[in-house]
Amino acid sequence: MKFIAFAFPFLLLLGGCGSGSNRTPPPWAAVVEREVDALGIQNWIIIAESSFPVVSRGGVRTLVVDGEVPEIVDYVVNHLEKSETVTPSFNIARELPFVSNDRAPGIDQFRKQLKEALHGHQVRQMDNRSLTLLSHSDASKYMVLVLKSKTALPYSSVFIELDSGYWDRDSEDRLREEMRTSEERARQQQIEANETNN
């Protein structure tokens, strides 16, 4: 497994998230874009809190990014919104809304920043353990990119599953149904032809 670290202290000068086009891209932007552009359907991007484990099995690539989760999410969402190749589905831990600011100082501000960074996209919630297991089980067949952030807050990772940008699940379901119907019709015609010949 490949592991790349980006240590850019001057990144601290770049403020929070937001999609202002006049902002200078962060130092890690080009590498993250290149990695994201290589992904396709059924791949995952995990924008992870700082304690997220480095997985030793193949299929998982970890990059340490000198940024906070909302900043990285904002950048990746901006990039994916320009893509015609893939469509993202966003997932967060079901536990996140229940973490109190008393026990995890800064979590209230984090939730506000994350909501902004997701640009109004629909977000599904699952148990954190289930999300981690699901994404890692897919890693046995498909690539998972982990962007490990500096964020030190519980349940703050964002799991992004990629689907086709030009062929959605509804289109795939309809295609499969049409194929089944056509094959069934052909079988029925063959049966009728055989009965006629006998």
Q: Where are these predicted regions, by residue range?
A:
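Glycine-rich, aromatic-bearing surface loops/beta-hairpins
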Residues: 103-198
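Structural motif
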Residues: 46-47, 91, 146, 159
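Long, hydrophobic N-terminal alpha-helical segment
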Residues: 18-70
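Acidic/Gly/His-enriched mid-domain segments of enzyme catalytic cores or analogous surface patches
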Residues: 23, 34, 57, 63-140, ...
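Sec-dependent signal peptide recognition
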Residues: 1-9
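C-terminal motif of bacterial Sec signal peptides marking the signal peptidase cleavage site
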Residues: 14-16
